UniProtKB/Swiss-Prot annotation:
Residues 116-125, 146-155 have a biased composition (Polar residues). Residues 101-176 are annotated as: Disordered. This is Carbohydrate-binding X8 domain-containing protein. It is a lipid-anchor; GPI-anchor. It comes from Arabidopsis thaliana. Residues 173-197 form a propeptide.
């Protein structure tokens, strides 16, 4: 019986992990940018994917999308949000190695901002100015509060972007799987100890 307690504690140390993160599925650049815009406009900490941010590199839309949706999901999961984004994201227990240090399974304590990563094609410049990164002219501006004017983005096929309210997602961020794994290991350990007695 004295062996049972240490085995029980060890099983929790090695098997219980809340390291599930929300990442974007592979998609075209336009769809990834829409997901980034939604997440950043909805409260994700997107300062970290700005040019001076810790998670700017690698400078790819997929990387920026992973960081943005995970930040959004970690901040909103306690209110019932899921990692779905209309099918554009999924829960992963093994995040991409290029962004793993930027994907935390708990929300950051920073103030949410609505910055947008540079994709080489978009800019926040004033009307009629030139984008210094591409040399392309642009006539776009952001609203005065640096957030999209709507929290719902409409795709050309009239589907909406946003966390799904369905129960198909895992609102616990993978905790249920970890608890099941821990339970199985615990029961196996108890059975092994009982058979030796």
């Amino acid at each position: 019986m004295a062996v049972l307690l240490p085995l029980f504690l060890l099983s929790f140390m090695f098997t219980y992990s809340n390291a599930a993160v929300c990442v974007c599925k592979d998609a075209n650049e336009l769809d990834l940018q829409k997901v980034i815009d939604f997440a950043c406009g909805g409260g994700a900490d997107c300062a970290q994917i700005q040019t001076t941010g810790a998670c700017y590199q690698p400078n790819t839309l997929k990387n920026h999308c992973d960081v943005a949706v995970n930040s959004y999901y970690q901040k909103k999961a306690s209110t019932g949000a899921t990692c779905d984004f209309n099918g554009a994201a999924v829960i992963s227990t093994s995040p991409p190695s290029t962004t793993s240090s930027c994907l935390s399974s708990s929300s950051s304590n920073g103030t949410p901002t609505a910055g947008y990563p540079s994709t080489g094609n978009s800019t926040t410049a004033s009307p009629g100015t030139t984008n210094p990164s591409t040399g392309n002219s642009t006539n776009s501006t952001l609203p005065t509060n640096d957030k999209p004017t709507s929290s719902t983005i409409t795709f050309p096929d009239s589907t909406t972007m946003g966390p799904s309210s369905s129960t198909s997602g895992d609102p616990n961020g993978g905790e249920e799987l970890s608890v099941r794994t821990t339970t199985i290991i615990l029961l196996t350990t108890i059975a092994a100890v009982a058979l030796r007695v």
